From Swiss-Prot:
4'-O-methyltransferase converting norbelladine to 4'-O-methylnorbelladine. 4'-O-methylnorbelladine is a precursor to all Amaryllidaceae alkaloids such as galanthamine, lycorine and haemanthamine, and including haemanthamine- and crinamine-type alkaloids, promising anticancer agents. Its cofactor is Mg(2+). The lineage of its organism: Eukaryota, Viridiplantae, Streptophyta, Embryophyta, Tracheophyta. Gene3D superfamilies: Vaccinia Virus protein VP39. It comes from Narcissus aff. pseudonarcissus MK-2014 (Daffodil). This is Norbelladine 4'-O-methyltransferase 5.
């Protein structure tokens, strides 16, 4: 039986390597402000085999505040897992807000669905079980200029981030935000070589090094790379 991703992720789980400081941030600022259904979902997800894919609570609060500051109403999420960031988004949107959520594995989403239902925000979510690229291509054909999206959050297959970007920069309105998760990849992107990584992690690491260089040079967006969680790059569409 092959090793799970947790077997080779846990050592380099996050950017912040001071466990004491991380604990302080979570216990002082994040957990006290965490919605009760998010807390329940986090605790269930932490017991899951792929728990390393969980968006941390402090990052969730960051996403929530950004959505509210933007007055976002129409959003896209690529990569859902158990739905922590999805529930975060749904809670932050107004009552008539809408999320198009895309993931290849509905069974993971169903782990989080009871918490989404208890939070009373299921009506905001359109979950699509599919690879993301064909769905995005269909959305490009069907979405009118006046119906462009305010915000997109990407936390899916890392080697496709650049492909997602080419679609999202057309689907998200001018002034809207596209966020890419994990762009610092446990800090390993800082090094031309990083021996000892699992082959899948090395592919992701190289993909992120290329993506980071590409986004920094893309004139269609302005960017800010934030060292929260495992690194989040915010792109604001300029044209």
């Amino acid at each position: 039986m092959g090793a799970s991703i947790d077997d080779y992720c846990l050592i380099h789980k996050k950017i912040l390597h001071s466990e004491d400081l991380l604990k302080y941030i979570l216990e002082t600022s994040a957990y006290p402000r965490e919605h009760e259904q998010l807390k329940g979902l986090r605790e269930v997800t932490e017991k899951h085999e792929w728990s390393s894919a969980l968006v941390p609570a402090d990052e969730g609060l960051f996403l929530s505040m950004l959505l509210k500051l933007m007055n976002a109403k129409r959003t896209i999420e690529i990569g859902v897992y158990t739905g922590y960031s999805l529930l975060t988004t749904a809670l932050a949107l107004p009552e008539d807000g809408k999320i198009t959520a895309i993931d290849v594995n509905k069974s993971f989403f169903e782990i989080g669905l009871p918490f989404i239902q208890k939070a009373g925000v299921e009506h905001k979510i359109n979950f699509i079980e599919s690879e993301a690229l064909p769905v995005l291509d269909q959305m490009l054909q069907e979405t009118k200029e006046e119906d462009l999206y305010d915000y997109a959050f990407v936390d899916a297959d890392k080697s496709n981030y650049a492909n997602y970007h080419e679609r999202l920069v057309k689907l998200v309105r001018i002034g809207g935000a596209i966020l890419y998760d994990n762009t610092l990849w446990y800090g390993s992107v800082a090094y031309p070589e990083y021996p000892g990584l699992h082959p899948e992690e090395e592919v992701a690491r190289l993909s992120f090094r290329n993506l980071n260089t590409f986004l920094a040079a893309d004139p269609r967006v302005e960017i800010s790379q934030v060292s929260i969680g495992d690194g989040v790059t915010i792109c604001r569409r300029l044209y």
